[in-house]
Structures are given as structure tokens and as C-alpha cells.
């Protein structure tokens, strides 16, 4: 695999690392969480993020509250806030999740999977079209992890998201860990499920850690990425190389409040080496479940 594939590796920007980034001699690609800034007209969080982003190799913008699959009208105030962040940070990718998070006037602080039906598909496409016209920027949708299924599901997840991308022109943020978690929870083969996604529509990738909760995997973003997930990413990147030699941004997510930046960057480097050479580095071992140490 050509080393050029790895020009666009990075991590999520978190407030706990602001001072470390200010002191860093160089800054890789960063993912900025839109919802941490969307209501800020000023203040320290916006100031720090702006100064750090100015030195980053590139920036991608990621949100969690678009509610693209919900029945409630899309929030114009929220979209206007995203638009301001686009103007400020000039991100190369603007994304949120293929899910719903509001219903009957109530806000769920979880990313709830959609019923994958033709009706839902048409609903999402219509809303994505509106979002892209409003923002004047391509919108990108991420696959979420799932722990339950619906009796009315009729379209596999990869096919569902790929058709939305084809018909709306939106991108796909392929979360490799979410593919792995969902597949294992439903006794599916992760590589088979990954192959359902149209990789030509993928313009960003996420990789993260997960945890074991009794008899299922849970997407927690609080541990090392296991070897099985890195291996799934390696196979994904190999497919990109065969298809069109594109450089797709890969973002390592970790929301553990205790993780220090140097450890996070070391894990990112270990993941690169694993994908290049099959060398595990500091990744945790897994055969479909997290290792005994909780990672």
C-alpha cells in the first residue's frame, strides 16, 4: 500500500488537550465537534479551537444533533450555526449521523438508528437535499452502532446509506468501529457488511474503541482500538487503493477524560503501522470482543 494513503490521519480535538496542542510543534488533521461551539459567539472554547485549527494540517467538522432522520422539522437556527462554523474553519468535510435524536418534542441524547425502509430513505434524502442547499456545502452521513433492530427493516445498512449518497450527492463517513460493533451484535460478518458500503462515496473514516457490556459490544470511545477493528480498517484502505488511490481522512476518536494527548498520538501512529505492516503496536488484542484488561 502506498504511504500517500496516510497523509490524512488525525484525531478529534478535545478541550482537555488545548494547552498541549498550543505547545505542539505541528498539528495533524483535527476533527472539531460542532456542538461544542455552535452556540458560542466568543469565549475561550472558540478562541482556543480557532487558534489550534489555524495550524492544523486540515479540519473536518462533525456534529451530533442534526436529527437528520427525525420527524421534527430541521432546526434552521442549528443549520445557521453550522454554516457559521463552516465559514470560520473551512472544513473539508461536514458531517453528522444517520440517525434520529428527537421525537414528540423530546430530545434523546443518544444516536438512535433509523428504520431502514423505503419510506425512511425518501425522507432522509429530502432532508439531506435541504441541508446541502442551506449550507452550500456537501453534507456527510455517518453510520451509527446498533443494539436493536426493527421489524420493518428491509434494507441492509450499507445499501441504505449508499443509496442516500448516490441520490443526494452526500458523502459517507464510514465508522469502521460501528460496522464492527453492529456486525458482532447481530452475528454478522464485519467485512461482508463493510463491503455493502459504496467506498467511492466515502470521504472520511472513523476508528475508535469499544467495550463489552455483558453479552454485546458497546461503542464507548474510551479505550484502545482493538486489533480486529484496525484490521478491518486496513482491509478498507486496501480497497481504496485498488479502487481509486484516494486519500481519505482517518480520524481516531477517544472521549476518555483521562487519556493524554501523547498516548492518543502514539495509538494513531501504531494504527498506521498496523495498517501498513500488520504490526499490532499498542493496539489491544481482540477476537471479536475486547481484551481482558477492558480495552
Each predicted region: which residue ranges?
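Active-site acidic/histidine proton-transfer and metal-coordination neighborhood
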Residues: 75-171
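Acidic (Asp/Glu)-rich catalytic clusters
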Residues: 20-26, 43-61, 77-92, 129-134, ...
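Acidic/histidine-rich catalytic cores of soluble enzymes
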Residues: 132-216
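Gly/Pro-rich active-site loop or hairpin
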Residues: 39-42, 73, 111-121, 182-241
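Boundary/entry segment of secreted carbohydrate-active catalytic domains
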Residues: 1-20
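C-terminal helical cap(s) of enzyme catalytic domains, especially alpha/beta-barrels
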Residues: 258-281
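Conserved, mostly hydrophobic/aromatic
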Residues: 30, 94, 175, 205, ...
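Acidic-and-aromatic substrate-binding clefts and catalytic sites of carbohydrate-active enzymes
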Residues: 16-19, 34-47, 67-77, 147-155, ...
Amino acid at each position: 500500500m502506498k504511504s500517500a494513503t496516510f497523509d490524512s490521519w488525525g484525531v478529534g480535538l478535545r478541550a482537555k488537550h488545548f494547552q498541549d496542542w498550543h505547545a505542539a510543534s505541528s498539528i495533524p488533521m483535527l476533527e472539531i465537534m460542532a456542538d461544542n461551539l455552535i452556540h458560542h459567539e466568543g469565549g475561550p472554547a472558540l478562541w482556543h479551537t480557532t487558534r489550534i485549527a489555524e495550524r492544523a494540517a486540515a479540519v473536518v467538522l462533525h456534529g451530533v444533533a442534526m436529527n437528520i432522520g427525525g420527524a421534527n422539522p430541521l432546526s434552521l437556527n442549528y443549520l445557521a450555526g453550522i454554516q457559521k462554523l463552516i465559514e470560520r474553519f473551512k472544513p473539508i468535510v461536514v458531517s453528522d449521523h444517520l440517525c434520529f435524536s428527537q421525537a414528540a418534542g423530546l430530545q434523546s441524547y443518544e444516536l438512535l438508528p433509523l428504520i431502514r425502509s423505503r419510506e425512511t430513505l425518501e425522507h432522509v434524502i429530502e432532508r439531506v437535499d435541504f441541508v446541502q442547499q442551506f449550507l452550500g456545502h456537501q453534507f456527510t452521513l455517518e453510520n451509527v452502532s446498533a443494539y436493536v433492530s426493527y421489524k420493518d427493516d428491509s434494507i441492509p445498512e450499507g445499501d441504505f446509506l449508499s443509496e442516500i449518497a448516490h441520490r443526494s450527492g452526500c458523502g459517507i463517513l464510514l465508522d469502521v468501529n460501528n460496522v464492527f460493533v453492529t456486525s458482532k451484535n447481530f452475528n454478522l460478518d464485519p467485512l461482508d457488511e463493510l463491503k455493502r458500503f459504496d467506498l467511492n462515496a466515502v470521504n472520511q473514516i472513523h476508528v475508535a474503541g469499544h467495550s463489552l457490556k455483558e453479552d454485546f459490544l458497546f461503542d464507548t470511545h474510551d479505550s484502545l482500538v482493538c486489533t480486529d477493528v484496525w484490521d478491518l480498517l486496513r482491509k478498507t484502505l486496501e480497497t481504496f487503493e485498488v479502487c481509486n488511490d484516494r486519500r481519505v481522512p482517518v480520524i481516531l476518536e477517544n472521549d476518555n477524560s483521562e487519556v493524554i494527548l501523547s498516548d492518543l498520538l502514539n495509538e494513531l501512529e501504531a494504527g498506521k503501522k498496523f495498517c501498513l505492516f500488520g504490526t499490532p503496536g499498542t493496539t489491544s488484542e481482540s477476537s471479536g470482543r475486547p481484551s481482558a484488561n477492558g480495552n
